[in-house]
């Protein structure tokens, strides 16, 4: 049942337009161009750290799939690309393999191939309110020898899904237990509706080490569930429900000291630069890599290399030699993102005057 649902999700994403109609919010963010960047583009360094591990670029292959025979090849190609490029990779929900050990190999193949990459295991937080505990979390981690455990928070999807689990009571308590008991860091991950500052603060207090905002602007799982069963009309109504990615980054970065993963509608290097300048640590990409991963790891690598080059150009044009420099560059927040910041009491003006270098001549 669970494995067939996973295949449904992949097929719908590939065959139907399930992208959000609401944008991720990066169109409201303007990086201030520097006509004299005072850097050599060839010297720009994309390396950074994520949860203590050095990676070659602030780009993550975000959680997509696993748990069905027909998607094993996708995970293989994603793993090859992650290993070659030294970037993190998150697997899809491992619940199917926890409940049916015959499906474990669709996940274990990832570590067999990506022996040095940063890997994130993945389970739904709602399962821990239904009986899962430390043992299941450890199984997921050990299955891929994971560097971290992502707990996905998907109340919207569960509410729309015909088989959905909607008892989210005591989930925060379960997150706290896992954060205290596991030897690897816990990442709280939304799946397309974003995370607000209130939840971000609570998650930090519960002990998570990173938040994946999973904002509005990319794939809509309400849309995916709508196409799975059109008799459930709510999917269409809630297609664009949630917090746009740029806004969610702003909320989480401003009110916590956690590492922020930006996912949800990120499609190019300029958006990556904007997300990092807003406070993200790394940016996750999923849907654009899905079709490519069905064909070959080379297509996945080509797409990620394109993103890296675009990010380098954006960094060059704002005078940033290192990823850390992006967090000091000037950016202007306009439009609905600015309106949101005002309504929520976030100081959006401070981002406009963070110039990396004051060039003194003579």
Language model region names:
Residues 254, 270-273, 277-325:
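Shared catalytic-loop signature of beta/alpha-barrel
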Residues 79-80, 84, 113-119, 126-262, ...:
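Alpha/beta enzyme core
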Residues 42-51, 75-80, 103-111, 136-140:
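Short, charged beta->alpha transition segments
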Residues 133-134, 138, 312-349:
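C-terminal domain-closing interface element
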Residues 50-100:
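Active-site cofactor/substrate anionic-group-binding motifs, chiefly glycine-
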Residues 72-73, 101, 131, 161-165, ...:
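Short, solvent-exposed loop/turn segments at secondary-structure boundaries
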Residues 86-125:
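A gly/proline- and charged-residue-enriched helix-loop-helix capping module
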Residues 1-51, 55, 335-338, 342-361:
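An N-cap/entry alpha-helix motif that binds or orients negatively charged groups
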